[in-house]
């Protein structure tokens, strides 16, 4: 019987990101603290259909060809491992592509969870998490969301206390750098000693201390991305000047964020921030997906 389901897929920020080294398989070992935030894509999944279809709104959202999209890759895994029939997906983008905010990972997680629910595939949490990791390192986190410490390539997840209530101003410059460019430049520099951000962030979260959290956020890759896209550092400086408790880049960028105690202060900072192609005020959320 044909049906449809809408799933909201939340973005993530990295309160901390440390690069610990390069593994034999070419991936980088990291330690990170991840937080879901109230910026989202929406997937409308319908099926079963005669063939897979993906429509992205708005056009030109920068998600790439269908066969390279994480949504398609997630469906192919479901088809191969669980016999999932084709579905039609309308993907409404609210998370900017190539931002380090996990939009592609969130979309894949939404497809895995949503198609499993819609089609009655009967996959459990462990099954979905295993498939999620085959799509990408951040996809397992996006399935569950909330606040977590991630290790390995980010797939080993340890839940953490939710942060004290606050607002984030998320901003993205007009141009950035790809993940491959950033890690390539990082490797070319020979890397650096990890910044130790995650330990300080974890202590701040466990203490429920927002000021300490703001002071602790950090990302080992910020100097690399800023070297490729100098606007990143300008946006970080603008957020600090606007009164952010702390400002940091998310993932490999080029999106950055600032933490604010009050919503009014966050909106004022967003209004005054110059040099951004994208600015939103959002808040932490306790899950990665919402739908039904």
Curated annotation (Swiss-Prot):
The active site is at 12, 138. Its EC number is 2.7.1.148. ATP binds at residues 96-106. GO terms for biological process: isopentenyl diphosphate biosynthetic process, methylerythritol 4-phosphate pathway; terpenoid biosynthetic process. It holds the Pfam family GHMP_kinases_N. Keywords: ATP-binding, Isoprene biosynthesis, Kinase, Nucleotide-binding, Transferase. It is an enzyme of class 2 (transferase). It catalyses: 4-CDP-2-C-methyl-D-erythritol + ATP = 4-CDP-2-C-methyl-D-erythritol 2-phosphate + ADP + H(+). InterPro entries: GHMP_kinase_C_dom (IPR013750), GHMP_kinase_C_sf (IPR036554), GHMP_kinase_N_dom (IPR006204), IspE (IPR004424), Ribosomal_Su5_D2-typ_SF (IPR020568), Ribsml_uS5_D2-typ_fold_subgr (IPR014721). One of its GO terms (molecular function) is ATP binding. Pathway: Isoprenoid biosynthesis; isopentenyl diphosphate biosynthesis via DXP pathway; isopentenyl diphosphate from 1-deoxy-D-xylulose 5-phosphate: step 3/6. Catalyzes the phosphorylation of the position 2 hydroxy group of 4-diphosphocytidyl-2C-methyl-D-erythritol. Belongs to the GHMP kinase family. IspE subfamily. HAMAP family: IspE. NCBIfam families: ispE. This is 4-diphosphocytidyl-2-C-methyl-D-erythritol kinase. It comes from Rubrobacter xylanophilus (strain DSM 9941 / JCM 11954 / NBRC 16129 / PRD-1).
